[in-house]
Amino acid sequence: MATPYVTDETGGKYIASTQRPDGTWRKQRRVKEGYVPQEEVPVYENKYVKFFKSKPELPPGLSPEATAPITASRPEGGEPALSKTAKRNLKRKEKRRQQQEKGEAEALSRTLEKVSLGETAQVPSAPQASRAAPTAASDQPDSAATTEKAKKIKNLKKKLRQVEELQQRIQAGEISQPSKEQLEKLARRRALEEELEDLELGL
């Protein structure tokens, strides 16, 4: 919004008096020669911004008419050009999907072969298949339990290391009066060592 100026008979410029929202009037203010109001001051642009604004969108020598058919020929709803990374990710997803389908197809063909072998072969293979299914299912909980044990072992080792550091600091005289918590930590050392041994034997 431009500031309304009023010029008097002597040629002096004034900012016209305006009414405030509460109904009172602001006085008109004299403006010095060459004054530019804040809202009319152009925004500063460094040389790089100016360069990129002045830079044409098309390469030199290429007319805008030549580019119009290319943009029009692109199908509506067509995907924009993908970056190299996006293309690579799409290929990976596609490959994974194909491998998964391939694996499912192979498993299906194996089960069909077992079924088509005949009645005599089918009877003993049925318990084997039922035995194989629980072992495959039990592998996952085993691996989860193993990782859980590994985490516990790591945590216990860390606690033992802290207890040892605390004991060394007390022996070196860095801590003259250990707090109640620190004494409890030292007392728990044997229990931590036993728990760690049990877990390591369980693995």
Curated annotation (Swiss-Prot):
UniProt keyword annotation of RNA-binding present: no
Any coiled-coil regions, as ranges: 81-116, 144-203
UniProt main location, coarse: cytoplasm
Region (eIF2A-like): 151-203
Residues with the Phosphothreonine modification: T71
Chain positions found as Phosphoserine: S63, S116
TM stretches of this protein: none
Region (Required for interaction with MAGOH and RBM8A): 1-32
Annotated region (Disordered), positions in chain: 1-30, 54-149
Localization per Swiss-Prot or TrEMBL: Cytoplasm; Nucleus, Nucleolus; Nucleus, Nucleoplasm
Superkingdom field: Eukaryota
The entry's keywords: Coiled coil, Cytoplasm, Nonsense-mediated mRNA decay, Nucleus, Phosphoprotein, Translation regulation
Pfam families: Mago-bind
Gene Ontology MF terms: ribosome binding; RNA binding
Classification via SUPFAM superfamilies: Pym (Within the bgcn gene intron protein, WIBG), N-terminal domain
Biased composition (Low complexity): 121-140
Keyword Phosphoprotein: yes
Biased composition (Basic residues): 85-96
Family of this protein: Belongs to the pym family.
Comment text on domains: The eIF2A-like region shares sequence similarity with eIF2A and mediates the interaction with the 40S ribosomal subunit and the 48S preinitiation complex.
Subunit structure: Interacts (via N-terminus) with MAGOH and RBM8A; the interaction is direct. Associates (eIF2A-like region) with the 40S ribosomal subunit and the 48S preinitiation complex.
UniProt name for this protein: Partner of Y14 and mago
UniProt source species: Bos taurus
